[in-house]
Amino acid sequence: MLNLKKSFTLISIALISTTSFASSHDHGNDPINSDHALRAILQCMTKVDNTLVINGCNLHIANGTGYTHKKNNVSAANGVGNLILGYNTLKYGSQTPELDRRGSHNVILGDGHSYQSTGTLITGRNNTVTGQSAVIAGSGNQISGYGSAIMSGSNHTIEANHASIFGGTNNTIYADATWGSISGGETNRVYAQLASVIGGRHNSAFGIASSISGGQFNQTTTSAPYAVVVGGSDNKSGSPAAVVLGGRFNEANGEASTVAGGFKRSTTGIHDYRAGSNFFSNQ
């Protein structure tokens, strides 16, 4: 009951202070207008059991700097103006980190988070955000890029702008991989713009707008924009628009060439084609 009383006391002080400031600014510190403004605010608030309901009003939280993100290349972040749901403890589990919480204008849920920027949505636990306008969930994840998102999973890192990771663990999108994405899997890496990895483990997309779907230890190289690897193990697409479809230790090194399965098959010419040893064995 004591905590509830304290909460309502703090709310009342905040409302009175805010209303007094607005009234003095607009009405020359007229106490009558101040009282009317306060009554108008309180009309939006009702208590239902243990719930404070705000109906018909906006809840506006700001940090007092006068701007949301940056102005004249100076950050608006000053550690206040955040909406924090829950206890926001410094510690979750056995760890006792020193957390940087200089951020402002963020929505924060869960414990053990570090937030230094503005305009982010943070949930889960033990996540770190230094990039603006990010969304982060899961646990032990980090975002330093602008407008990027980690939607679930653990121990992911995004350095690029406008990149995304959905699920899995220990996946990384590096700084040059703007608009890159990883969907699930483990220890996958994206290095180039618009590149993507879907599932699998230890796959690396170096080619611009290249894609790897499943499998393990597969790679598209820096000289292979628009290349594709689908499944298999230790396969490599090393030329523009080249494709490897499954198998092991296959390489598509000719432009727009295809290797369809098999073991240690390779292409070198434009539009070349190779397949596994069980069919088209003489090609």
What is each stretch, according to the model?
Residues L2, A14, V53-I54:
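Terminal amphipathic alpha-helical/low-complexity segments used for targeting or macromolecular assembly
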Residues S17-S20:
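N-terminal signal peptide c-region/cleavage motif recognized by signal peptidases
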